């Protein structure tokens, strides 16, 4: 499937993934993230239920603590 992730095109060898499964394809390890799917913020507790499909647009933001 073809996605737009943080403004860049990305191909995934799957027809549909949960957001949790999609995040595991990214090189970010176990860092906590915020996700926007097609302009809508997705709650972390919904990551297993919400799906990513061909043509979707995602923004994935890593949360970093600092002082």
Model region roles, listed by residue range:
Residues 1-66:
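Ubiquitin-like/PB1-type beta-grasp interaction modules and other compact soluble beta-rich domains
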